[in-house]
From Swiss-Prot:
Similarity comment text for this entry: Belongs to the FliE family.
GO molecular function, one term: structural molecule activity
Disulfide bonds: none
Annotated HAMAP family: FliE
Xref: InterPro entries: FliE
Protein name (database record): Flagellar hook-basal body complex protein FliE
GO BP annotation list: bacterial-type flagellum-dependent cell motility
Protein's organism: Escherichia coli (strain 55989 / EAEC)
GO cellular component: bacterial-type flagellum basal body
Length: 104
């Protein structure tokens, strides 16, 4: 008898999970704008550069707990993120120019 009750318990849990999944599917998803994503990416690049600059200043001042390898890693991360941002901008400008040169 306890095996049947265990199976019924599992079935009721599965039904509850299925109902909650259906309820979540019916909720409207927030819209994500291109401009918002671009702004967020630029903010992340800026934050990375600020963190690297702060880390370098701490190392220069001789604060304990700041190692040279951490500073160099942060500086490289900032450099790579900046280069990525520049390349994305270049691709966006090229795409814009291509669209503007199309004849209607």
């Amino acid at each position: 008898m306890s095996a049947i009750q265990g199976i019924e318990g599992v079935i009721s849990q599965l039904q509850t999970t299925a109902m909650s999944a259906r309820a979540q599917e019916s909720l409207p998803q927030p819209t994500i704008s291109f401009a918002g994503q671009l702004h967020a990416a630029l903010d992340r690049i800026s934050d990375t550069q600020t963190a690297a600059r702060t880390q370098a200043e701490k190392f220069t001042l001789g604060e304990p707990g700041v190692a040279l390898n951490d500073v160099m890693t942060d500086m490289q991360k900032a450099s790579v993120s900046m280069q990525m941002g520049i390349q994305v901008r270049n691709k966006l400008v090229a795409a814009y120019q291509e669209v503007m040169s199309m004849q209607v």
